[in-house]
Structures are given as C-alpha cells and as structure tokens.
C-alpha cells in the first residue's frame, strides 16, 4: 500500500509539472509565434533605500507618506505634496522623465566644470567657460570643437541648431516610439548591450546603483540651475567662482552677490 501511494504521488507530481511546462510553453509562444518568455516576478531589494522602512524626506519627523509611495522605486522618500504621483501612468512617465533629465544634468554639469579644470591646469582648447564657448561661433573664425579646426568647424548658428533638432528629434522619436534595437528591454534601465561593464548583473548592487544615480542626478539638476544663476549674476564659470569664494569667502558668496546684483550690468 505504501509503495502504491508513493507511485501515485510521483505520477501526480509529474503530471502537474508537465501541465505547468505546457502552460509556460504556450504563453512563451503566444507573442506572434515567438518564444519570448520574460521573467515577471521580481524579488524586493533588500537595500535600506527600499520598502516601508526606507529613509523619509524629513527623517523621523516625516508625516504619513501617501499610500501610492510604497518604496518600490529608487529615490522614493515618501514626499509628494502636490500629488504628482497619484496616477500610476503619470507616475511611470514622470519617473522616466526624471531619470533622463538626471542623466543629461550629470553630463551637462561635467561639461560645465571639466573644461575649466583643464584650462586651470594649462590645457588650451579654446574658450573654457561653458556659457561663453558657444558664442565663438559668431566670431570671424567660427567655432572649432575642442579648439581643433580638424574636427567640427562651425560657422552658422542656424546650421548647428537645425542639426541638433534633427539628430535629437530622431533619437527621441526612436526612444518614444520604440524599435528593434531596444525591443524587449526596459525603457529606463535597458541593460544588455547598454551595460557593457555588467554593473546590473547583481540585482542587489543594481538596486543600490539606481538609488545613487537618482540622488546624484537630482543634485546635478540643482547644480545646473546654480550654474545658470552664477553665469547671470557673476559672469564667471563655476570653477572661477569657487576659486574666488575660497580666496575671499566674505566678499564672494551668494548673499554678497544677491544684495549687490543689478540686472543688465
């Protein structure tokens, strides 16, 4: 009797496993006759930056967080006073836009400070101050990218503007509309060929990197805003402003410039 029970149990297990495999096979081949199965079950990251016990925007003094901010996504500190994330579709779109703007801001901030740093260390490649570099196109000799006439030599602002509109329009159109290059990949974190260093191979490390990216990206967006204000108020680049402040903190600070700033001068 015991042997019979064991055999029946084994047969039932094999039958269930066969049925499960058959279901997976059918689902996998449903998409246009192609086996395109994807893993949809995700384990929650064990990082302190996720979940209900994650750090909040005011620490222990934070108010009750909205029910739709569960700590599932990176950079969620439970703060949404305006209710911008209440609608799931709007929330998903805003998350994508924020990550994209974060990446552009980090590249832009680096592009604002790096030429000045090189210039301070004796490397000459044209105008180093970021908001003055583009104005060289109006000079008689035009604008040489990286100060090298053998690279891109621009003399028409309209041609540069049109080229950027076309190139960025094509890229953004492809990103929004989709195409074979990114088919089946996550729109924000595609991985694969877009992760040649394999930084996303470890799920827990990848979850931490997402948080670091969004935090540094938000800081970069604020930095870019500060660079814009500095350019208007002081007429200098961020590195030169930093050197001036270190040399004389009393005379060169935000309060001193704000109280003495006269628009148009």
From Swiss-Prot:
UniProt: chlorophyll b 3 binding residues: 156, 172
Positions annotated to bind chlorophyll a 6: 245, 254
Role, per record: The light-harvesting complex (LHC) functions as a light receptor, it captures and delivers excitation energy to photosystems with which it is closely associated.
Main subcellular location of this protein, as a coarse class: plastid
UniProt subcellular location: Plastid, Chloroplast thylakoid membrane
Topological category with respect to the lipid bilayer: Multi-pass membrane protein
Binding site for chlorophyll a 3: 136, 146, 213
Cofactor binding, note field: Binds at least 14 chlorophylls (8 Chl-a and 6 Chl-b) and carotenoids such as lutein and neoxanthin.
Post-translational modification: Photoregulated by reversible phosphorylation of its threonine residues.
Modified residues (Phosphothreonine): 40
Taxonomic placement: Eukaryota, Viridiplantae, Streptophyta, Embryophyta, Tracheophyta
Binding site for chlorophyll b 2: 103, 152, 181
Domain notes: The N-terminus of the protein extends into the stroma where it is involved with adhesion of granal membranes and post-translational modifications; both are believed to mediate the distribution of excitation energy between photosystems I and II.
UniProt record similarity statement: Belongs to the light-harvesting chlorophyll a/b-binding (LHC) protein family.
Subunit: The LHC complex consists of chlorophyll a-b binding proteins.
Binding site for chlorophyll a 1: 79, 85, 98, 218
TM segment ranges: 99-119, 151-171, 219-239
Binding site for chlorophyll b 4: 164, 175
Binding site for chlorophyll a 2: 101
Transit peptide feature range: 1-37
Name of the encoding gene: CAB36
Protein name from the UniProt record: Chlorophyll a-b binding protein 36, chloroplastic
């Amino acid at each position: 009797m015991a042997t019979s029970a064991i055999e029946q149990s084994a047969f039932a297990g094999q039958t269930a496993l066969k049925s499960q495999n058959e279901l997976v096979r059918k689902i996998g081949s449903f998409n246009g006759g192609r086996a395109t199965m994807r893993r949809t079950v995700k384990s929650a990251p064990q990082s302190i930056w996720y979940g209900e016990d994650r750090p909040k925007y005011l620490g222990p003094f934070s108010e009750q967080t909205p029910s739709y901010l569960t700590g599932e996504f990176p950079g969620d500190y439970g703060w949404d006073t305006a209710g911008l994330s209440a609608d799931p579709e709007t929330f998903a779109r805003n998350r994508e836009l924020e990550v994209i703007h974060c990446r552009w801001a980090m590249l832009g901030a680096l592009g604002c400070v790096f030429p000045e740093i090189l210039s301070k260390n004796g490397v000459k490649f044209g105008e180093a101050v970021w908001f003055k570099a583009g104005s060289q196109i109006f000079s008689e000799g035009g604008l040489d990218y990286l100060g090298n006439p053998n690279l891109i030599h621009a003399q028409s602002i309209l041609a540069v503007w049109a080229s950027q509109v076309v190139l960025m329009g094509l890229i953004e159109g492809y990103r929004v509309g989709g195409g074979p290059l990114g088919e089946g990949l996550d729109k924000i974190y595609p991985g694969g060929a877009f992760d040649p260093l394999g930084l996303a191979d470890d799920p827990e490390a990848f979850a931490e990197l997402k948080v670091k990216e969004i935090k540094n990206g938000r800081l970069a967006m604020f930095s870019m805003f500060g660079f814009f204000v500095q350019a208007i108020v002081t007429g200098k680049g961020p590195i030169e402003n930093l050197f001036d402040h270190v040399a004389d903190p009393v005379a060169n600070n935000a309060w001193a410039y704000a109280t003495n700033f006269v628009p148009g001068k």
